[in-house]
């Protein structure tokens, strides 16, 4: 990972800043979250309360990410974001809004060309860490995935509130699994390399965006989590996710797919595509998602099974375990897992 987010400019009114800092200063909250996840180099956060102050800061200092919170006038925020993007096209800009149906309706009518992402602030600093990691993953995807061979998890979702809720859970899971994997490292340097070699996470909000990412990185795709209804060819398509997953399945019969939807009838398509199905209405969706990823995306211990009965043969925790047990693993089990890319995950 060559590019990192070191300096964040947060543009928020005094009221919004007060709401965000109920549990302490934003920079301190991010620092403690980084420490809990065993991450290095937490970013520094500079807070300003007006757009004028923001432009002054940008003129004096280099920033790697701009997060802006709209006040009463939502349109003004997006207008100023476009002005910032014209002057600093290389800086990602994220709009962080309080969630309400009224705000969602207003955002749907706005010109979003000046912003990279819109997120809903749900009161948890986990979201800020997820935003920073999402930006870093996007900045480093070209080199880390194409040249180094790092794997990718693709989330396809257009609901601002939903991806704002699920991304922190997804990153928390991936980072903690990487922590477990890094404990096998021989030294501190190798441990850090393993942490930085974790799977990338990328977010697509339209059919075309999902197709572009898949076509570019299909050889390194670890798994896909997709909604069903989102924009395709400029209009809302209630089956866009099914069409996308059908294309993916025609290219790769074994890639793990998770289809999530608030409409139960879509589970029939998931069965047809040999994909897992998650109900977005479930109160334990984050737990269900974590269990499904752990089971299907190759995290955790590896269990060789009998391909005919599904019964477990042996569970492998590390390379030493594999060396010790390779002789008792039947050829047909080894072939079953290898031919489906289970081992390479």
Question: Which residues are covered by each model-predicted region?
Answer:
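Conserved phosphotransfer microenvironments
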Residues: 19-26, 40-42, 47-59, 63-93, ...
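Hydrophobic/aromatic residues positioned on beta-strands within the core alpha/beta folds
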Residues: 96-98, 259-260, 280
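As written
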Residues: 107-118, 269-278
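Short, charged/polar "capping" segments at the starts of alpha-helices
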Residues: 17-20, 101-105, 163-164, 265-268
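Non-catalytic signal-transmission and effector/linker regions of two-component phosphorelay proteins
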Residues: 1-46, 82, 110-117, 121-200, ...
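Amphipathic alpha-helical packing elements
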Residues: 335-345
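Polyanion-binding and phosphate-handling cores
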Residues: 242, 246-252, 265-297
